[in-house]
């Protein structure tokens, strides 16, 4: 699965997935506004947004890259490109 994932935040608009996270929570960033990062948990019919600091989001994305490299994941290039676009 190499598709991009987007969510609509009720206040900040479109968010895009930056990295899968831990415990069923993924990391998303604002698409149009000043960069804000969210830890997002999706349950049956509810979505929970938690604002997180830039460095926490970057750390989680780096951990995801390391994990993808160890596994030899087919999606490694996708995550590397997203990391560069978002954090560098």
Give the residues covered by each predicted segment.
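Short intrinsically disordered terminal tails
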Residues: 1-3, 74, 85-88
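A short beta-strand micro-motif
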Residues: 5-9
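Acidic, low-complexity, intrinsically disordered interaction modules
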Residues: 11-73
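Ubiquitous "structural anchor" signal
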Residues: 20-21, 29, 80-81, 87-88
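Residue-level detector of alpha-helical secondary structure
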Residues: 62, 69, 77-80, 84-87
């Amino acid at each position: 699965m190499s598709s991009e994932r987007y969510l609509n935040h009720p206040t900040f608009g479109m968010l895009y997935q930056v990295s899968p996270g831990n415990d069923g929570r993924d990391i998303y960033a604002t698409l149009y506004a000043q960069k804000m990062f969210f830890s997002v948990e999706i349950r049956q019919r509810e979505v929970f947004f938690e604002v997180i600091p830039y460095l926490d989001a970057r750390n989680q994305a780096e951990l995801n890259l390391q994990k993808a490299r160890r596994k030899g994941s087919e999606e490694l290039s996708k995550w590397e490109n997203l990391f560069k676009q978002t954090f560098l």
